[in-house]
């Protein structure tokens, strides 16, 4: 990792101290810093490195147009975000491990920036050879697990036993969490899935109610109601998390709530578009002026 072990971000929520090595976050909100001192970059950024994926999940909302981001351009964007106060970057896709320089990008972010490095993967390419290149270069790994056992195999078309084997390799490299798409097919697996997460040592269980796509209408109201009740009664040891778009409905607590919108989060698509989230189709193209110029342009779009 970079010699920088901690970072201080100033924004509308206060002064935010963050250590990417330990994961410690401390928000000093007793005094509101003047607006002129606020950092300009979003607190967190996600980047779809490529649209390529070798799974065909019916509910996937990622674009299917072939696109892969250039390594050198990506490095420039990461440096910009770092210099302007972002705390972390999450690589996704598609399947990020299919980017030809995936390991190099993780190394650049770890060695040349002070950003916390995470990525989301289906996990099946995270074999020991690749994982050995990621040691000390990623801070957290998210594995997508929609359903468990036979449900997982039906929806993802891959062996659940193979997924478990990859998971056990992953946990030797970095702390990990499980991403769980909630819909009519998976909601009955919630209890078994959270038990599995606990038994395997997951640090977080991210609930992702299915988003609507041109092919599917998203999670139904009946399933939403069941999910809300499940969250309300949850008493397990694995930390629950939820996407920002569903946070209010599921009663999530956000200590940085004053830092919302583009101050909290932004997404870059594999087509080099800066967006407010990965679920949105609108955004602005990132041109030669850089990603911060694109951010200023996006802020003007209501």
For each predicted feature, which ranges?
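Conserved alpha-helical substructure of the radical SAM core
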Residues: 9-10, 19, 23-121, 125-132, ...
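Secondary-structure transition/capping residues
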Residues: 60, 68, 116, 163, ...
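Alpha-helical interaction segments
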Residues: 7-8, 67, 142, 195
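N-terminal hydrophobic or amphipathic segments with adjacent small-residue motifs
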Residues: 17, 87-88, 117, 141, ...
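N-terminal pre-core extensions flanking Radical SAM catalytic domains
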Residues: 1-64, 82, 253, 257-279, ...
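Short, intrinsically disordered/low-complexity patches at protein termini
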Residues: 122, 201-202, 213-214, 298-301
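Radical SAM enzyme [4Fe-4S]-AdoMet core and its adjacent flexible, acidic
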Residues: 137-140, 144, 150-275, 279-292
């Amino acid at each position: 990792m970079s010699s920088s072990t901690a970072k201080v971000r100033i924004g509308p929520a206060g002064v935010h101290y963050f250590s990417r090595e330990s994961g410690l976050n401390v928000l000093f909100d007793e005094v509101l810093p003047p607006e002129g001192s606020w950092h300009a970059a979003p607190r967190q950024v996600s980047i779809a490195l490529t649209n390529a994926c070798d799974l065909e999940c019916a509910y996937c909302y990622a674009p299917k147009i072939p696109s892969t981001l250039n390594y050198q351009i990506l490095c420039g964007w990461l440096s910009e975000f770092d210099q302007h106060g972002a705390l972390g970057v999450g690589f996704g896709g598609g399947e990020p491990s299919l980017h030809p320089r995936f390991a190099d990008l993780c190394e650049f972010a770890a060695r040349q920036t002070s950003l916390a490095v995470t990525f989301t993967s289906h996990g099946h390419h995270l074999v020991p050879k690749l994982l050995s290149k990621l040691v000390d270069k990623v801070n957290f790994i998210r594995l997508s697990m929609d359903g468990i056992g036979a449900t997982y195999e039906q929806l993802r078309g891959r062996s659940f036993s193979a997924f478990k084997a990859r998971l056990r390799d992953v946990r030797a490299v970095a702390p990990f969490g499980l991403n769980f798409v909630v819909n009519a097919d998976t909601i009955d697996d919630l209890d078994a899935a959270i038990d599995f997460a606990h038994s395997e040592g997951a640090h977080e269980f991210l609930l992702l109610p299915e988003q609507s796509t041109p092919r599917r209408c998203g999670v139904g109201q009946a399933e939403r109601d069941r999910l809300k009740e499940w969250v309300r009664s949850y008493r397990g040891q694995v930390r629950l998390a939820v996407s920002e778009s569903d946070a209010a409905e599921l009663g999530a607590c956000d200590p940085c709530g004053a830092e919302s919108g583009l101050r909290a989060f932004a997404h870059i698509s594999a087509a080099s578009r800066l967006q407010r989230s990965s679920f949105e189709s609108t955004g602005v193209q990132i041109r030669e002026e850089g990603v911060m110029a694109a951010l200023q342009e996006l802020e003007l779009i209501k």
